């Protein structure tokens, strides 16, 4: 008992006739006496290993009639349970020797613009011209096609297009055009809604400015709140329908809308007159009437095949016609100025005054700067409601 356990068991392990009846602890894998679970957990590498070869070679009837213990005992059929050390597979050969007989490395593909230039940008004309090349046609026709197509690479465009679309389908649609086609209406709708909301605030802003003229120095208030049906204090620009001042508010809004409509009409007339789309006959000096008709001395008739008459004719009492060319621009403006000058003689003095102001340009500019500096804040508060109309006017000016 005092001797080391390993020494006593080593002698016992040399006796190959000692059987292992029930298969417990085969090859001493779980025997704690041989320090299998302490210093050397893996029994395959334990120096005190004592194999029992006869335990792995159990014959029929070796342990009694009709009784054969399970091979490997309680640990199963694995090689480790049988005390056999399994080795890992050998390392593969290096890549230098493997590539001599194995798969070759994939070469670098050339860029798409060199191999398929027709695929860079869809163009029907260039695409059909590129199909005349046999190398390009090989991408769309099967390899086993007829030899006549290869020998005659210039078939009709209709048959070629139909054959291509029957195999490959319709060409891919340009997503950039689709995106721009969808976003453009949305952006226009957003701009229209924004301008509409701003335009609807113009009558309210002008109404506030209009009513503020009646309450100089005092906060504005609706006078209808002191009537027999008392209403809570409110501004004259936000009267409820039950307030007596509601009808006056609606009247002011209606007048403001008419004023805005008149302003838009004046802008449209100015735009058409600038484009030369108002062929108005000018007045002769000293005359107040004009009449259009066929001209005897002009090269183009007043009512000919041209879109607009290029000259106007006045018919005095003697029967002779006097032809006057219509200005290509500002014809209506010149007509109004001549008509006003014929009736108001003092306007001629205004022309001289304007010319004098133009001659004194530094002084005029300083005067304008001073006026803007002095009245600028008030003008900005008055003109700020009309700022949303400016983009509309600019768009109409550029489109017509």
From Swiss-Prot:
InterPro entries (UniProt xref): HBV_HBSAG
Q: How is it used?
A: Systematic vaccination of individuals at risk of exposure to the virus has been the main method of controlling the morbidity and mortality associated with hepatitis B. The first hepatitis B vaccine was manufactured by the purification and inactivation of HBsAg obtained from the plasma of chronic hepatitis B virus carriers. The vaccine is now produced by recombinant DNA techniques and expression of the S isoform in yeast cells. The pre-S region do not seem to induce strong enough antigenic response.
> Which residues are listed as membrane-spanning?
182-202, 254-274, 349-369, 376-398
- Please outline how this chain is modified post-translation: Isoform M is N-terminally acetylated by host at a ratio of 90%, and N-glycosylated by host at the pre-S2 region.
Name the keywords, alphabetized.
Acetylation, Caveolin-mediated endocytosis of virus by host, Fusion of virus membrane with host endosomal membrane, Fusion of virus membrane with host membrane, Glycoprotein, Host-virus interaction, Lipoprotein, Membrane, Myristate, Transmembrane, Transmembrane helix, Viral attachment to host cell, Viral envelope protein, Viral penetration into host cytoplasm, Virion, Virus endocytosis by host, Virus entry into host cell
Region (Disordered) location? 70-115
Comp. bias (Polar residues): 79-88
The role this protein plays is: The large envelope protein exists in two topological conformations, one which is termed 'external' or Le-HBsAg and the other 'internal' or Li-HBsAg. In its external conformation the protein attaches the virus to cell receptors and thereby initiating infection. This interaction determines the species specificity and liver tropism. This attachment induces virion internalization predominantly through caveolin-mediated endocytosis. The large envelope protein also assures fusion between virion membrane and endosomal membrane.
Name recorded for this polypeptide:
Large envelope protein
What is the scientific name of the source organism?
A: Hepatitis B virus genotype H (isolate United States/LAS2523/2002) (HBV-H)
